[in-house]
């Protein structure tokens, strides 16, 4: 949602040094896990959405952020993906699962499968590659409304 990637939201490590404790996280290029892993390679994609969808998406993210202590990282669901199974837990997400959930709640049309993986976002209608390379070297130019980072 932030073309400068100063605010990125997802479900991942709560502590950059401990991969086993996860939940809702707010990160940036120089904050959190990406600060620790300075050589992270990334691809930033965008899709066009309406102002109304953008506002809904913002509301959804901020609602989850305000109640983040109620949410957990869906470790079981993430492991299940590797086994081609879907295990959905209440108030628990892995990264791609959260993006799909937020898009659905914001009424952003998508063709994502039930068992969603980061590479599935490449099949979104009208997706556009904005940047590929080292995250620390990312510089914003003119990006559309919604960025799906780190696919």
Report each predicted region and the residues it spans.
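Activation targets extended, charge/polar-rich intrinsically disordered C-terminal tails
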Residues: 67, 71-151
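Surface-exposed beta-strand edges and flanking loops
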Residues: 46-49, 131
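A structural motif
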Residues: 30, 35-39, 48-78
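Glycine-rich catalytic cores of cysteine/serine-nucleophile enzymes that process amide/ester linkages
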Residues: 1-47, 78-87
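Detector for Asparagine
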Residues: 4, 15-18, 30, 39, ...
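Generic hydrophobic/packing signal
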Residues: 8-13, 57, 61, 100
């Amino acid at each position: 949602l932030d073309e400068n990637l100063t605010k990125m939201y997802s479900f991942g490590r709560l502590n950059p040094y401990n991969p086993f404790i996860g939940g809702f996280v707010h990160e940036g290029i120089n904050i959190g896990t990406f600060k620790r892993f300075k050589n992270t390679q990334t691809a930033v994609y965008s899709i066009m959405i309406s102002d109304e969808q953008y506002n809904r998406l913002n509301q959804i993210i901020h609602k989850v952020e305000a109640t983040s202590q109620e949410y957990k990282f869906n470790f079981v669901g993430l492991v299940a993906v590797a086994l081609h199974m879907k295990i959905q837990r209440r108030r628990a997400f892995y990264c791609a699962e959260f993006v799909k959930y937020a898009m659905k709640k914001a009424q952003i049309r998508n063709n994502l499968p039930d068992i969603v993986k980061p590479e599935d976002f490449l099949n979104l209608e009208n997706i556009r590659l904005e940047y590929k390379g080292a995250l620390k070297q990312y510089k914003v130019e003119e990006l559309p409304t919604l960025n799906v980072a780190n696919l």
